[in-house]
Amino acid sequence: MKYTSYFLALLLCVLLGFSGSYGQGQFFREIENLKEYFNASNPDVAKGGPLFSEILKNWKDESDKKIIQSQIVSFYFKLFENLKDNQIIQRSMDIIKQNMFQKFLNGSSEKLEDFKKLIQIPVDDLQTQRKAINELIKVMNDLSPKSNLRKRKRSQNLFRGRRASM
């Protein structure tokens, strides 16, 4: 993998921002360990521009930003999974993953397991593709705003109630 990917992956962790002075200090030390290990401070890392920070600038709305952040966090989990056998940087990756888990998934183990399941789904498997297409309508319905539907049902119920009482 290119060093640029590693450096920018670490940059996202910084962008997510972590609270707590002790935890934050340790977090930054672990990032520095990874930067040193991957030689991420080398000037050639900047070649081609950043991976994520420019994309994040384009998304202002908080709920929209969460969508992009989920894709970026997914990248980091895949990156860390790819490097899981590297004992030299394992501790640093574990601390960073824990911080991401707390910040992005609010410390929910169930959400983490679901998130891991999603990023492990192979997109080049025919059976997976068939299942995904089969579920597409339900997924699209879940993506649709529900507030308008609720308002419409509520106003219909109010209208029916008035008609019955007249």
From Swiss-Prot:
Protein name: Interferon gamma
Keyword field: Antiviral defense, Cytokine, Glycoprotein, Growth regulation, Pyrrolidone carboxylic acid, Secreted, Signal
SUPFAM superfamilies: 4-helical cytokines
Superkingdom of source: Eukaryota
UniProt-listed GO biological process terms: adaptive immune response; defense response to virus; humoral immune response; positive regulation of autophagy; positive regulation of biosynthetic process
Pfam annotation, one family: IFN-gamma
Signal peptide as annotated in the record: 1-23
Subcellular location: Secreted
Glycan-carrying positions: 39, 106
Tissues of expression: Released primarily from activated T lymphocytes.
GO molecular function: cytokine activity; type II interferon receptor binding
Function: Type II interferon produced by immune cells such as T-cells and NK cells that plays crucial roles in antimicrobial, antiviral, and antitumor responses by activating effector immune cells and enhancing antigen presentation. Primarily signals through the JAK-STAT pathway after interaction with its receptor IFNGR1 to affect gene regulation. Upon IFNG binding, IFNGR1 intracellular domain opens out to allow association of downstream signaling components JAK2, JAK1 and STAT1, leading to STAT1 activation, nuclear translocation and transcription of IFNG-regulated genes.
Keyword Secreted included in the entry's annotation: yes
Quaternary organization: Homodimer. Interacts with IFNGR1 (via extracellular domain); this interaction promotes IFNGR1 dimerization.
